[in-house]
Amino acid sequence: MLISDRDIRTQIDSGRIVLDPFEPSMVQPSSVDVRIDKLFRLFDNHKYAHIDPAEEQPELTRLVEVAADEPFILHPGEFVLGSTYEAVTLPDDVAARLEGKSSLGRLGLLTHSTAGFIDPGFSGHVTLELSNMATLPIKLWPGSKIGQLCFFQLSSPAEHPYGSGAYGNRYQGQRGPTASRSHQNFHRTEI
């Protein structure tokens, strides 16, 4: 069940859901707006002949930091990783979903490719998968609204919440945009 604004505030006030820093004005009818940080992870496309999710490719991306009062310029067709300014911590019976802001989507900005779901038990900054689908560069201002988190009450607490180790916790406690760690649990069925 999607959690309403009043229940979001109750969960935050009780410390069950933690957003750090939390700004009460960011609460919407059924979500909380989140802001973009000043750290970005750019792809160095010339370091590898291809991307292989089964292999560790430590030089595939590099971290850059823009000044707090300067925008990051996302060029048409470009894909970079960013992160939320807020760190998010969820209890074992609440999941979340990152959604983009409609106003930014109408400008051609996508905030995530596929990883919009946040498991119960997660704690850390949410990595954004940013794409510019427009024909002009887009300025991304640190501290500006970039998306919104919707929260879902589970029917019961997760038996093995994220971070417990049962299903893996490769991104638990992440700070800033975190590169893919797909090689750590790559699975391929022989067919």
From Swiss-Prot:
Pathway: Pyrimidine metabolism; dUMP biosynthesis; dUMP from dCTP: step 1/1. Pfam families: DCD (PF22769). The keyword Oxidoreductase does not apply. It catalyses: dCTP + 2 H2O = dUMP + NH4(+) + diphosphate. The record marks G116, F117 as: Important for bifunctional activity. GO terms for molecular function: dCTP deaminase (dUMP-forming) activity; dCTP deaminase activity; nucleotide binding. InterPro entries: dCTP_deaminase, dUTPase-like_sf, dUTPase_trimeric. DCTP binds at K101, S102, S103, L104, G105, R106, D119, T127, L128, E129, Q148, Y162, Q174. Bifunctional enzyme that catalyzes both the deamination of dCTP to dUTP and the hydrolysis of dUTP to dUMP without releasing the toxic dUTP intermediate. This is dCTP deaminase, dUMP-forming. It comes from Renibacterium salmoninarum (strain ATCC 33209 / DSM 20767 / JCM 11484 / NBRC 15589 / NCIMB 2235).
